[in-house]
């Protein structure tokens, strides 16, 4: 579980619409363990402070930032009976302030431009992380050490009640999604009652209600000591500097009591069991789960290879059988979820409408038996190896965040006692044979699965939301092991914490790779930013099309046609395309946004030539075969049906036509998926016409970032695109009309029975992304609802505790763009929450205007985040894409700092008045109308209508 969800805000250039035993105190260990697999290595230095805190340091000086990743070796698996959800609740409390720095934890980090800031809890660990400018490292370490060593005096009943409410709404939000209750059911039936993994991390409402301040103190004292903690610093730092700073800030924190370490217990089952769950879903889903070898076990990487062969994509056994051949399901996947005590091997299949799930299970059983008998082929294994290697290499570009190098090192150290343990898994994957994978599969996957079938609830029937009964207590649980006795001692601190958080007055400058331009021999313009940190090249072909090009056509044409590109060329079918992509380690994808359609390539430098040949064939020569069209059509219709069971999907489908009118280019479902009627009527002529009119060289810009040069990439692109000629017919001109804004508020209610939360979405029209005062509009939005400490979020989440989060955001657009507010709130506070949204909207342009302090906060946050915002090749490509789409100059990013600094209060206030229209909002509220309709009507927000998920007014 993460502390808060990623913001829905559009970034610049993007479009929005997700144990070692204690070593000697002075010893430092530099990268031991096996030789790098295929050259993959994350060099590190490890040392232990006298108080037992483990430190791992990795140097990466490509950007002036340092990732700080702190892992406490405690998670939901350590919760005693009656305390489920407490580890995650405590994670939230860690953001409530500390004894020497009261108030929300985020403010100092926002002021220095921190990125990738969050906290998460899982079965075996709780982690907190952020990436900060190098000059702000002292501030970050002071903050982390203050809450680690000085928390309890800052946590009272108010803080506990606030975060309890936030967590309970996080639980409601998760359960308010289709299939949102499956994890709880699967865990309860996969593991015995005395297994640490039998309950999910979010916990039960009753246990969360029962959490007390005494529990907080006990948990902190038991688990948040220095000797139970690993800190990884990765980025622009040296081991010497890291040691000095960690000793300064953390050296006086007590080691804490020894923590009994739970031992691996797979609890594999001997017999197959079944369960059924009814939910508000559009189609039946079959989930099968096996308990398998834990992280670090020699079989775990082999099972990942087996999962890829069985259900890793279009080339996999089950996809071939169930989707292509028998046409029984719309999708099927298989994955391993690795954990410290046991892993889960999970199959998920979404059954086609009208198909008997029994037939699906029979086909799965046949493929399963065949795999257990024969194992994978040599080619299946090679494809899996390449995919694994390429994916790992791509992850090495980022120092922090959810999955960067700091996370790899921390996970290896915390779970396996060695920061380089990941190399063992890479080596096992490289050394695997069909025989070893088959043997591992037979050891773990031949018996003992739990099958959960999730079926659509009948209309008018209530779902059973009672907690699953689950398995009883079982024998065989290994005893916990105490760590080796160690003589830890905290040092006397010389740090005066009463002086407050260290001030940061110096900040690094932005370094953005130069944008180089070229032209292919047929006139196609290319833009390149070189980035040689990893051997990867990313590319985007940007076509002026998008959802807006559906105007006058069947809705969903652009998205559907783009989705068909990699389903077959004149010489290759979809399986062969997928097979070649896997062997090359390449990722090719195509899709549409509001104003553009694109085809993207992420390729290894060593395989770029062959990857480009495949890429060009997909773009230039789509086959649009009837069989592929029908297969994708079935999946597409299933996706639309799923959208109409999801609160967010319902709102994003219905709001745009209300804002723009249903004849406008933007008056369409913002999911881009169209309607059932339009998708059913699409034929090959429609798709070929779209491709002929929009996917053409005179409507194209090629954008590249990564490990290449302008001369080299121009030569390679000329080879595959240089002879591409446009037809004589001109590119159609999209008509994006200006819309008169509504003059009064309107409210549209959509019924979703049994919903534990209501989704409140408001919309109004704002100026185009291309307007001169876009920066002022974005600053205003950051203050109102676009950051964690924004007015909306602090009100509904931190003050009222009615929502897991509340935000406002602008959907980037060439024409007028929608300005939206979003909050998913507990059902019994729907009307009150809507009133608060309206109050905040009125206040920011009325009696509580934007302050100098708020402006300074957003300015500082955005300016100081710039140096760390372009660490990855993908983020650089995002700027090239945004520049091309919105006609920005090449130095757009380099001049952002000056333009941000130059904003005036008057201009930002004017932006607020131009965008925020509290008394002319269009409200879409999705929830249980039996409970919310009367209170919402009583608010008198505006004219109230009830409509269905298709936007049809019912009354």
Language model: regions and residue ranges:
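Bacterial N-terminal signal peptides
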Residues: 1-8
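Proteolytic maturation boundary segments
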Residues: 10-56, 238-278, 284-285, 289, ...
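M16 family metallopeptidases and their MPP-like homologs
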Residues: 56-58, 63-81, 85-89, 103-150, ...
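Metal-associated gating/positioning segment near the N- to mid-region
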Residues: 93-100, 104
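A common structural junction motif
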Residues: 145-155, 249-257, 365-376, 617-624, ...
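Non-catalytic, conformational "gating/processing" segments within enzyme and secreted inhibitor domains
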Residues: 157, 164, 217-249, 449, ...
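Short, conserved secondary-structure transition motifs
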Residues: 166-174, 265-277, 385-396, 603, ...
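Alpha-helical scaffold elements lining the catalytic groove of polysaccharide deacetylases
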Residues: 207-216, 679-682, 687
């Amino acid at each position: 579980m993460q502390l808060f969800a990623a913001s829905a805000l559009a970034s610049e250039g993007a479009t929005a619409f997700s144990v070692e035993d204690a070593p000697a105190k002075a010893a430092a260990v530099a990268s031991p363990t096996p030789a790098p697999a295929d050259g993959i290595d994350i060099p590190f230095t490890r040392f232990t402070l006298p108080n037992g805190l483990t430190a791992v340091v990795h140097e990466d000086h490509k950007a002036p930032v340092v990732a700080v990743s702190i892992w406490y070796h405690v998670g939901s698996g350590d919760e005693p009976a009656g305390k489920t959800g407490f580890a995650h609740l405590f994670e939230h409390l860690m953001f409530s302030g500390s004894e020497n720095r009261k108030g929300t934890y985020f403010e100092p980090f926002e002021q220095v431009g921190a990125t990738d800031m969050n906290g998460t809890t899982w079965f075996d660990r709780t982690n907190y992380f952020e990436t900060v400018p190098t000059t702000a490292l002292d501030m970050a370490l002071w903050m982390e050490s203050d809450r680690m060593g000085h928390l309890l005096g800052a946590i009272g009943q108010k803080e506990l009640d606030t975060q309890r409410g936030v967590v309970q709404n996080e639980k409601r939000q998760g359960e308010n999604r289709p299939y949102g209750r499956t994890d709880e059911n699967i865990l309860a039936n996969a593991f015995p009652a005395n297994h640490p993994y039998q309950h999910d991390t979010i916990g039960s409402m009753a246990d969360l209600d029962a959490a007390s301040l005494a529990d907080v103190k006990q948990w902190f004292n038991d688990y948040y000591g220095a000797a139970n903690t690993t800190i990884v610093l990765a980025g622009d730092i040296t081991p010497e500097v890291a040691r000095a700073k960690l000793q300064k800030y953390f050296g006086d924190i007590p080691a804490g009591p020894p923590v009994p370490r739970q031992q691996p217990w797979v609890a594999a089952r001997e017999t197959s069991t079944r369960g059924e769950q009814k939910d508000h879903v559009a189609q039946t889903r079959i989930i099968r789960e096996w308990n398998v070898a834990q992280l670090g076990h020699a079989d775990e990487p082999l099972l990942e290879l087996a999962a890829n062969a069985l259900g890793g994509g279009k080339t996999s056994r089950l996809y071939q059988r169930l989707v292509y051949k028998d046409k029984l399901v719309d999708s099927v996947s298989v994955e391993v979820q690795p954990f410290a005590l046991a892993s889960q091997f999970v199959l998920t299949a979404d059954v086609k409408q009208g198909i008997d799930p029994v037939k699906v299970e029979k086909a799965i059983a046949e493929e399963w038996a065949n795999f257990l008998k024969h194992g994978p082929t040599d080619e299946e294994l090679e494809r899996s190896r390449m995919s694994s290697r390429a994916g790992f290499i791509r992850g090495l570009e980022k120092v922090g965040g959810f999955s960067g190098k700091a996370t790899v090192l921390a996970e290896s150290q915390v779970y396996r006692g060695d920061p380089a343990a990941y190399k063992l898994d890479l080596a096992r994957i490289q050394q695997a044979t069909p025989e070893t994978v088959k043997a591992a599969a037979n050891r773990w996957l031949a018996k003992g699965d739990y099958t959960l079938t999730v079926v659509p609830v009948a209309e008018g029937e209530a779902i059973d939301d009672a907690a699953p009964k689950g398995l009883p207590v079982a024998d065989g649980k290994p005893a916990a092991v105490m760590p080796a006795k160690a003589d830890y001692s905290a040092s006397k601190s010389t740090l005066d914490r009463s002086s407050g958080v260290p001030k940061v007055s110096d900040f690094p400058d932005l370094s953005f790779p130069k944008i180089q331009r070229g032209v292919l021999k047929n006139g196609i313009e290319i833009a390149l930013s070189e980035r040689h940190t990893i051997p990867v090249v990313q590319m985007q072909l940007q076509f002026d099309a998008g959802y807006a090009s559906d105007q006058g056509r069947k809705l969903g044409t652009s998205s559907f046609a783009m989705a068909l590109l990699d389903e077959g060329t004149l010489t290759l079918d979809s399986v062969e395309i997928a097979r070649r992509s896997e062997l090359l380690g390449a990722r090719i994808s195509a899709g549409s946004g509001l104003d553009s359609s694109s085809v993207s390539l992420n390729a290894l430098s060593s395989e770029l030539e062959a990857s480009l040949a495949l890429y060009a064939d997909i773009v230039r020569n789509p086959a649009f075969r009837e069989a592929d069209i029908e297969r994708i059509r079935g999946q597409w219709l299933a996706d639309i049906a799923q959208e109409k069971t999801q609160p967010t999907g319902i709102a994003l489908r219905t709001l745009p036509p209300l804002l723009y009118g249903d004849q406008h280019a933007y008056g369409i479902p913002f999911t881009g998926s169209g309607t059932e009627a339009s998708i059913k009527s699409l034929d090959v002529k429609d798709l070929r016409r779209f491709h002929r009119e929009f996917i053409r060289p005179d409507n194209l810009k090629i954008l590249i970032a990564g490990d290449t040069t302008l001369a080299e990439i121009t030569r390679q692109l000329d080879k595959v695109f240089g002879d591409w000629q446009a037809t004589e017919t001109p590119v159609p001109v999209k008509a994006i009309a200006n819309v008169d804004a509504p003059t009064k508020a309107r409210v549209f209610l959509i019924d979703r029975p049994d919903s534990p939360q209501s989704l409140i979405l408001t919309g109004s029209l704002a100026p185009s992304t291309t307007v001169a005062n876009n920066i002022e509009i974005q600053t205003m939005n950051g203050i109102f609802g676009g950051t964690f400490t924004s007015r909306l979020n602090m009100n509904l989440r931190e003050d009222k505790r009615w929502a897991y989060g509340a935000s406002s955001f602008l959907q980037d657009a060439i024409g007028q763009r929608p300005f939206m507010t979003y909050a998913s709130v507990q059902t019994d506070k729907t009307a009150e929450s809507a009133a608060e949204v309206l109050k905040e909207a009125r206040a920011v342009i009325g009696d509580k205007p934007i302050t100098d302090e708020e402006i300074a906060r957003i300015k500082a946050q955005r300016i100081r985040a710039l140096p760390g915002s372009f660490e990855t090749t993908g983020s650089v490509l995002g700027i090239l894409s945004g520049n091309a789409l919105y006609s920005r100059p090449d130095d757009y990013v380099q001049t952002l700092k000056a333009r941000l600094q130059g904003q005036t209060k008057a201009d930002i206030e004017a932006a607020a008045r131009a965008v925020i229209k509290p008394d002319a909002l269009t409200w879409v509220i999705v929830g249980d109308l039996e409970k919310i309709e009367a209170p919402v009507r009583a608010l008198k927000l505006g004219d109230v209508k009830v409509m269905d998920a298709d936007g049809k007014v019912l009354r």
